[in-house]
Amino acid sequence: MSEGVSEQVKVGKVLTVDDVRKVAHPAYPYMLPAMEPYSEKDAYDMLSGAVDMHLHGSPTGWMPYRPSMLETSKEASLAGMKALCFKDHYYMTSPIARIIQESLETWAIEKGIKPTNVYGGVTLNYAVGGLNPHAVRTMLKGDFAEYSKVLWMPSIDSDLTRRSAGLGDGITILDKDGRLKQEVKEILEIVSSAEQHVAVESCHLYVEEIMKLAEEAEKHGVTLVVTHANQELTLLTVEEARQLIDMHAWIQLVAVSMLGTPIAAPGWMVNYYHTMELIKKLGPDKIILASDAGQTGAKPVEYYKLMIWSLLTRGVSKAAIRKMTVENPEAALKLRS
């Protein structure tokens, strides 16, 4: 860094040069304040009743050696977790959720425990036709409809993701005049009129797109969850998050964007302190915690536990964590208590 550069020069949406210098200090680990005295068991025990509404696994069309969805579901059951909702970038996960649930029921009886509830959904990438109302209707019918809980807007094929990665244009939910495309309105209408409650996640959209989506979702009475608002690609400022909360959206903060993924994305600079700031300034009432794990080397139940443990040791109360891991995702997904 050249001399005279302002400490407040941004190296990300909110991260400054000063922030980077602090965490790059050679004595950084030895200068941190003492942790609150919570053990790993304290964090693990808090998984009981928790919901992880955004996680990944195998089988998948992208990234080898992801954790098995079935094995993750077993680990969640052993921890007493209430529900999981698996996401894949390429295919509808609701049918797989049904198959996993049936297998899990038999296994849980043998173990003498209660199985976690397993759900899925669909992500509107090119593999399912993009912003495709037919894919949404398919998710909501048939003998796997009850396992559909989340509809994700485009992720790896979104305009934001593709342009950020230097891959050219991608899918946008806005037309050339900056208004929501008709097919997006149709999709929200399908969701709002369905017998099965489904939450919509913003996924990898520009903030401008999310704001327009939130306005329309509110009109239709559709539950909107703003996906990994602590990840640099889709990061929200405190002010943006407040604006979306005012439109009745939930703000999702995820473990991998707080803690990093050393195998799948070594060296990834994450927004740990911005995650803490969002929790502190917004409060827990409209925040949902999730793992977003399931990448190579990132087991979802383990990552969720580590996120909880980290928050406990940094002063976030058990009551606030329970709100963000149990009560809020239950409300967003309309799960029975």
Predicted region positions:
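An N-terminally biased module of ancient metal coordination in phosphate/nucleic-acid-related enzymes
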Residues: S2-T116
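Active-site mouth loops of central-metabolism enzymes
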Residues: A50-S68, G120-G130, T172-G178
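Divalent metal-dependent hydrolysis catalytic cores, especially in the metallo-beta-lactamase
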Residues: D52, E71-P95, K114-A127, S148-S158, ...
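Histidine/acidic-residue-rich catalytic or RNA/ligand-binding cores of hydrolases
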Residues: G61-R66, S94-R98, I210-E216, L235-A241, ...
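Extended substrate/RNA-proximal surfaces in nucleic-acid metabolism proteins
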Residues: N125-T227
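Catalytic pocket-lining loop regions of alpha/beta-barrel enzymes
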Residues: S202-V270
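Short acidic/histidine-rich active-site segments
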Residues: V254, P284-V301
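Mid-to-C-terminal alpha-helical segments outside catalytic/metal-binding sites
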Residues: E302-S337
